[in-house]
Amino acid sequence: MMSKVFAYLDHIFRMVRPRRLLYMAIDGVAPRAKMNQQRSRRFRSALEAEKLRAEAAAKGEPEAAGDPFDSNCITPGTPFMARLSEHLKFYVLKKQTEDPLWQKATVILSGHEVRGEGEHKIMEHIRWARGEPGWDPNQTHCLYGLDADLIMLALVTHEPHFCLLREVVKFGAGANSGQPSRETLQNPTDDGFLLLHVGLLREYLDAEFRGIADALPFPYDCERVVDDFVLLCMLVGNDFLPPLPTLDIAEGALNTLFSTYRELLPTLGGYVSGDDGGGTFDAKRLEVILERMGEMEAKVLADRSRDAAANEERQARRASGGRGFGGRGAKNGEKGAAGSGAGSRVSEADARFKKAMAALANGAGADDAVAAAAAPDAPLEPEKETSSGISADPTMMSAAKREMFEEGGGGIEGWKEMYYREKLGLKIGEAPPLRELRQAYFEGLSWVLQYYYRGVASWTWYYPFHYAPMASDLADGLGSLTAKFDYGVPFRPFEQLLAVQPPQSSALLPEPFRWLMTAPHSPLAAFFPDELKVDFEGKRNDWEGVVLLPFLDEHLLKQCIASVPASKLTDAQTARNKPGPLVVFRHAPDGVGDVASTLPRAFPGLHPCRSEALESMPPGEFPKDRKCFGG
């Protein structure tokens, strides 16, 4: 496996040929706000793996020899990640010793032991480097990765020369489930990759909005428009907040948002993003836009009601005609066809594009998004209990909610009352709980925007609800809200492992901690339920389902971790639980001594090694009075 990793890195390096710096960033411990999503994905992944094993056993297929590879091991603090870091260090030493191309650039390795998500560690480096003497504002940046948020991260830098590199992903049946083709991974060629020039996207945004320049009572500024664009995109979904209930890309929500923005901007008195260019926003101006979106909620929901009823009728006709759907079935709890009436009339390619964009906006990985776009539609009503142990409510819009939009129904107010009661346990007349929901979502928008522009605002903050408020309720008094964050400290690796892993992956933790995930009498037992409930109502794809896991009690979790004596851990385990440094590599023509190979069967040692590795601790909180990104 490591040899293949090395070969793939070789190919990417030779395509891009960095002349100044190569920054290799691996995910370290994430902010608490991200752990909710990580926890949901890992729990679902574990249940799906169990389901596949059960299906294979039912078919009489032999079990694979040895323990199956648990992809959840790709989490900070595991033995796998520790080995990966050591192998990558040797790999860089080897390349700078032997390969002239690698000798020209400085290499920084930020491994799993360095806190922060990989792409945000790269942004952190750029943010700090911009303030250093000798920074070249015309240098070119190339960011490689598959994550959905890289475009937004590239935009917020306001760097003029920024491009994104990723593999070509195939659409359609038999296309490796949205993954890069096997040929690309096994025998990579330049034709297997795509390069997005973010500067070109900036030009398109400028062309889109420059037409309103004459109508503005303040100077038109493309950089501020870019910041506003990023903020508006946050409203339809990100890795840290659920999307607003009536904003769905597949229904044209982004187009509606941008049209509303174009119409209202001349009346707002300025841009929605903050004047400091530091990831803030003017809540009163955003309130005006959300009020307009709130006025459209009744129509959006009424359209959904009609589409759901029509789709249910089509399903019934097909069933009575003896024809079923191919692909993913109802028993898998997966959501099928749908969207607005207009969506059913667009071409297949447009429909796939909308599905993929919806996936990206709602926080799915890029590969998940493409898989969703390629997948066939599934039946409307899944079973209440699936074979994988995942419970599913009716998809699309339930019959009870559809009745709200029939003649004599409760309309939007009735729908809201049912939504808040069923999804959030709130009564619409209870002002304090609704204020708490609004405040939490406002804090979430503030946290996410600061995260993109300035880095982590708080390591411990998270959104404590599974659902978002309605746009009209979020807008109510938004302009008077404020957000203040406590920076806090990152989780330690074993704390994050315990926070995000399902019981099926308990072996990834040192033995003294495993009972906390598996024992019925564990103080944390309530946070590791036997049955995983997923709400698919209103969702078109399985990955969109809302995983209804209880939110972990951080203080209780840390108490449980602290209750295990350090003497019960080996030296290697203790080392894996500590934060570590960045490693900076530079070519050393005169040599620095011999280095043993970490993979002696595949690669010889370096005699001598001609690369110098120096350790450096990552920077702390970015100064609040220092200019970061922004127009």
Residue ranges, per PLM feature:
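Noncatalytic, typically N-terminal accessory segments of nucleic acid-processing enzymes
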Residues: 1-631
